[in-house]
């Protein structure tokens, strides 16, 4: 398991390792499982940059079912597949190889952003376990191993060591390391942290960027916005009654606590979706747009990278600042459009670039070369997405401190999100440091 900070070269390190193992004959092939954008834009492109890996032959196991099958049967060194197709992969390998007693075309597997396998009860983890014993070499890559606490580790190590260190049962894992506090809450035992660190330390290599080449400072600036009294009254009514009538006459209703949380966050951002799952939204206020405008004015033309939470946020930002010809990187679906967008940013021809953190984290590099200002128009609950997005600018090659503006509505769930992210970061940093110390004491 490789826990390497963003920007430390996980891709080329892994490519070099697998090229060596292919050359020695230990591996006959490797399949890499990664987010779809990374599959399309990262691994092949990185391999051709280096003398020791440019010879590797890749097969893209994407597209329709027939296209994936043909790609899987095509002789290659490295096969690339996205997480969403893991179930299909397990079924197809069983049909074409396992049941016919044929060797798989690969005996090595790499999990790029293995944190996506953190939940051991998901179908993708269950599907892989059916073929897990067919692999002689497994590597997991991530920069955010425990963004939501130690429970995230069970599924990740299950697909790496088949349950040798943390067990095969999620229920048994929780019983062993957590105690119940009330009907729904669980907290770790006092020795949980130390025990887990010792169990996983022998196969976990941690490397922090700041240990080798210090990253620039991240200066977090929380911009807290006060709601006017009339807007505050509406927000409080929504939180209290799970119901609100908008100025347009449209009714907004939340049927459970999770839905209410989402509605409150939409309200804070300035637009709401009256009907869940429908694309139509209604404006509520422009307070965050005004705050973003102030940030852009202060930047005086320096490129600003802005994270949004909802499609309504993106549309309103693009409309408000259309005179800047902004780029929504999330909408750059092809390699050509992504390349053009990155070129505009790197040449100083883009004052505002926006994107959803889920599509902006993995596989986007180069933004640090011409920008140092981040804005969170709306936060999320995922530390992984939060740190990955920030790392687009705060990474190797950045020469100045990075400014991270977080636009927060005062006394709303915006602040709860900020506090939750800060708390999770403390837990993960402690885990990474402890694993590093464990390996040092072992002389690894």
Protein language model regions, located:
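A conserved SF2-helicase RecA2
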Residues: 381-444
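Conserved helicase motor
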Residues: 37, 59-68, 83-88, 118-122, ...
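Conserved Helicase C-terminal RecA-like lobe
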Residues: 6-9, 13-35, 214-239, 243, ...
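Inter-lobe coupling linker of SF2 helicases/translocases
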Residues: 80-86, 98-99, 118, 122-136, ...
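Conserved helicase ATPase motor motifs in RecA-like P-loop NTPase domains
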Residues: 6, 135-150
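SF2 helicase motor core recognition
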Residues: 87-90, 148-150, 313-318, 338-342, ...
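Conserved helix-turn-beta segment of the N-terminal RecA-like "Helicase ATP-binding" lobe
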Residues: 38-63, 160-163
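Conserved helix/coil segment N-terminal to the catalytic DExD/H
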Residues: 65-78, 83-105
């Amino acid at each position: 398991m490789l826990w390497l900070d963003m920007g430390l070269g996980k891709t080329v390190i892994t490519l070099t390792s697998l090229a060596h193992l292919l050359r020695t004959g230990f591996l006959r092939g490797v399949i890499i499982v990664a987010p779809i954008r990374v599959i399309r834009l990262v691994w092949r492109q990185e391999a051709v940059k280096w003398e020791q890996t440019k010879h590797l032959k890749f097969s893209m196991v994407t597209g329709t079912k027939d296209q994936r099958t043909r790609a899987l049967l095509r002789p290659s060194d490295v096969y690339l597949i996205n997480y969403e197709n893991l179930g299909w992969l397990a079924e197809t390998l069983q049909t074409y190889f396992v049941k016919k007693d044929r060797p798989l075309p690969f005996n090595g597997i790499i999990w790029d952003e293995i944190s996506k396998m953190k939940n051991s009860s998901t179908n993708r983890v269950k599907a892989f376990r059916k073929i897990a014993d067919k692999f002689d070499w497994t590597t997991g890559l991530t920069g955010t191993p425990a963004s939501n606490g130690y429970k995230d580790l069970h599924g990740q190590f299950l697909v790496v060591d088949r349950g040798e260190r943390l067990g095969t049962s999620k229920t048994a894992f929780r019983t062993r390391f957590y105690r119940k506090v009330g009907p729904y809450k669980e907290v770790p035992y006092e020795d949980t942290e130390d025990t887990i660190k010792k169990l996983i330390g022998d196969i976990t290599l941690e490397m922090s960027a700041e240990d080798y080449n210090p990253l620039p400072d991240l200066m977090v600036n929380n911009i807290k916005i006060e709601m006017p009294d009339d807007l505050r009254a509406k927000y409080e009514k929504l939180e209290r009654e799970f119901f609100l009538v908008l100025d347009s006459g449209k009714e907004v209703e939340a049927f459970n606590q999770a839905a209410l949380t989402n509605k409150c966050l939409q309200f804070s951002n300035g637009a709401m979706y009256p009907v869940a799952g429908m694309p139509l939204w209604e404006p509520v206020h422009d307070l965050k747009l005004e705050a973003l405008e102030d940030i852009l004015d202060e930047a005086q033309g320096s490129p600003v990278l802005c994270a949004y939470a909802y499609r309504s946020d993106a549309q309103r930002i693009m409309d408000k600042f259309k005179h800047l010809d902004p780029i929504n990187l999330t909408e750059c679906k092809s390699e050509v459009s992504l390349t053009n967008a990155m070129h505009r940013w790197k040449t100083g021809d883009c004052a505002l670039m926006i994107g959803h953190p889920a599509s902006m984290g993995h596989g986007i590099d180069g933004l640090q070369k011409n920008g140092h200002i981040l804005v969170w128009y709306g936060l999320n609950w995922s530390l992984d997405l939060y740190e990955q997005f920030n790392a687009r600018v705060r990474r190797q090659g950045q020469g100045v401190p990075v400014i991270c503006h977080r636009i927060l509505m005062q006394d709303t769930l915006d602040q709860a999100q900020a506090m939750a992210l800060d708390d999770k970061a403390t837990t993960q940093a402690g885990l990474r440091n402890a694993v590093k110390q464990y390996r040092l004491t072992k002389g690894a």
